[in-house]
């Protein structure tokens, strides 16, 4: 699905998810399913982690999906929320360009971006974060690095590190949670926050040098974190109710896969 394709329609779960629906059981086995939106994700890592658990998942971003998945909407998340809801769970990765503390010093120096004050773009980015946090979804996780979200909206519920989840990397990642528990470390590597990781120079800086794609490379969710989100949040059901389907019989609203 891309931004040029409008509308959503019901499709059978077994047609949409294929063998994933029936894996590990008979055709009549009833399983819990959640409808999940992964907002502002082009890599597909979080989407695919939840899909591997058998959930009904769509990602969206203004960029196309790197894996050319049919379960990606290239466009505005507001369109998805308005036309494809309700969702049980949303995980959002709002762009951090004008939010991260590492760049906020430019806001006080009169820097212009395409003729607009950078500080103005920070305000717009904060408004977008508020929109995501206040979306009509019972369970929400908003992810960002250390940013002005903490001082302008509220402090994060949790700050995690990739090396808690088996990734030899250091990157403080903040989570603002609604209706979700904190993530538990799954494979904490030896060391602490002072330990130099594979993605760092001896001075503690990120090894990725300046390039047009640096922001893109750094914005990908680490696989260990994506897997932990799917494993720990994928079994939760909003409102204490079980959302179940009967394989091959129940129909559910979803995006039409592109042809």
Predicted regions located by residue number:
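Conserved active-site and SAM-binding loop architecture
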Residues: 2-259
């Amino acid at each position: 699905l891309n931004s040029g394709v409008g509308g959503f329609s019901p499709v059978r779960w077994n047609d949409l998810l294929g063998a994933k629906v029936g894996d590990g059981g008979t055709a009549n086995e009833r399983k819990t399913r959640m409808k999940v939106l992964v907002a502002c994700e082009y890599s597909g890592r979080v989407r695919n982690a939840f899909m591997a658990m058998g959930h009904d998942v769509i990602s969206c971003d203004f960029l196309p999906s790197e894996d050319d998945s049919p379960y990606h909407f290239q466009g505005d998340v507001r369109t998805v929320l308005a036309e494809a809801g309700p969702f049980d769970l949303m995980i959002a990765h709002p762009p951090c360009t004008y939010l991260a503390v590492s760049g906020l010093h430019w806001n006080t120096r009169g820097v212009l971006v395409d003729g607009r004050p950078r500080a103005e773009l920070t305000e717009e980015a904060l408004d977008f974060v508020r929109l995501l946090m206040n979306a009509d979804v019972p369970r929400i996780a908003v992810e960002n690095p250390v940013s002005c979200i903490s001082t302008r909206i509220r402090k994060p519920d949790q700050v995690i590190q990739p090396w808690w989840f088996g990734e030899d990397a250091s990157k403080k990642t903040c989570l603002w949670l609604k209706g979700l528990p904190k993530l538990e470390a799954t494979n904490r590597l030896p060391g602490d926050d002072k330990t130099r990781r594979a993605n760092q120079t001896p001075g503690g800086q990120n090894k990725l040098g300046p390039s047009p794609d640096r922001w893109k490379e750094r914005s990908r969710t680490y696989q260990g974190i994506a897997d932990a989100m799917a494993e720990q949040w994928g079994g939760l059901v909003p409102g204490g109710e079980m959302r179940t389907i009967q394989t091959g019989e129940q129909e559910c609203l979803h995006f039409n896969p592109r042809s």
